[in-house]
């Protein structure tokens, strides 16, 4: 399992396919994923090691409602502020596009590639076709909680400049979530006929809450 964060940042084209260049100077996590891909594909080319590389994007489940920026206590800290009627930090102006994928939808694509001869030596993206702005993402959470969405917009650069010790907002934002991305999963759908992510984010987040 690799990561969609491994794709080139800043993005050259917001439309992302498996052929998009890999390079992320902002996030060590992503560079480590790229290095692992290189090792595995080398083993496939030189010794026939059967490898399939998966690049997911922000897969989530009922255990945690995913957000862009949170404190040491995770996303529940953000939800607590919402319930208290307080504003929440939204990076940038909240207009960049992002993709969230419900874990059961990811699993359908993943299982469809297991033992699939079309998958050997290949790379696949597994994620939802739904693209949402961060404003829409946070508003979905607020709606699920039954409270108003009160954004407090802060530039990613300022968040990075003032981050507490132990945080890596440069990687998390500039290297990942602050970029507008739209993923093309047509390759996966050719290899796994019938694959379709069916759980929309607003439905998934209600399962979390």
Predicted regions and their residues:
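Glycine/small-residue-rich pyrophosphate-binding loop that anchors the diphosphate of NDP-sugar donors
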Residues: 97, 177-180
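Conserved catalytic-site region of short-chain dehydrogenase/reductase
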Residues: 4-14, 28, 59-63
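SDR active-site strand-loop-helix element
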Residues: 1-4, 54-56
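NAD(P)-dependent short-chain dehydrogenase/reductase
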Residues: 46-97, 141
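Active-site Tyr-X1-5-Lys
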Residues: 24-53, 62
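Mid/C-terminal beta-alpha module of Rossmann-like enzyme folds, strongest
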Residues: 112-173, 185-186, 190-191, 206-209
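Residue-level signal for the nucleotide or nucleotide-sugar donor/cofactor binding architecture
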Residues: 31, 101, 132, 183, ...
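Substrate-positioning beta->alpha
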Residues: 70-78, 91-114, 121-122, 136, ...
